[in-house]
Regions:
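Metal/cofactor-centered catalytic core regions of large enzymes
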Residues: 1-143
Length: 143
């Protein structure tokens, strides 16, 4: 569970989104732990529509939490392959995944009743001054 309200940056999902293989990447702009912008073709338009639909059906207190960065993880299984199977995709070695939406099962405050996961094939992941993953290679090296 990412620390709520703390994540900032750009996430480019280029593997699969919610178990669907992507032909073009979907870009999420995250500020203070919330997705504030989505771009990248027809799949991103579908995602925006889905999130708008969720916003119209949740409690008023949860509307701002629909875009919560709910999960972030790394794939570590060298035998897994990107296939469109959501559970396998998120564990491919060198990949990373994010989930947006509900994080209540992990103790978070976003209770919006849905979660969408996206997989990045060869990401670069930085945490302050440490490169955790460089172009899909697990490094955990200080810059």
């Amino acid at each position: 569970l990412p620390k709520e309200g703390s994540a900032n940056g750009k996430i480019v999902i280029d593997g699969s989104l919610d178990g669907e293989m992507l032909d073009e990447p979907v870009t999420l702009l995250v500020e203070e732990g919330n997705v504030i912008e989505i771009s990248g073709g027809s799949v991103s338009e579908d995602l925006i529509s889905k999130m708008d639909s969720i916003r119209s059906s949740v409690k008023i207190s949860q509307i701002d939490k629909v875009g919560t960065l709910a999960e972030f993880g790394f794939g570590m299984n060298p035998r897994s392959r990107l296939s469109g199977n959501q559970l396998e995709d998120q564990v491919v070695r060198g990949s990373s995944y994010v989930a947006i939406g509900d994080n209540s099962s992990l103790g978070g405050s976003s209770r919006v009743g849905y979660q969408i996961r996206g997989v990045m094939i060869k990401p670069t992941v930085e945490l302050e001054d440490v490169d955790l993953v460089l172009e899909g290679k697990v490094t955990a090296r200080k810059r």
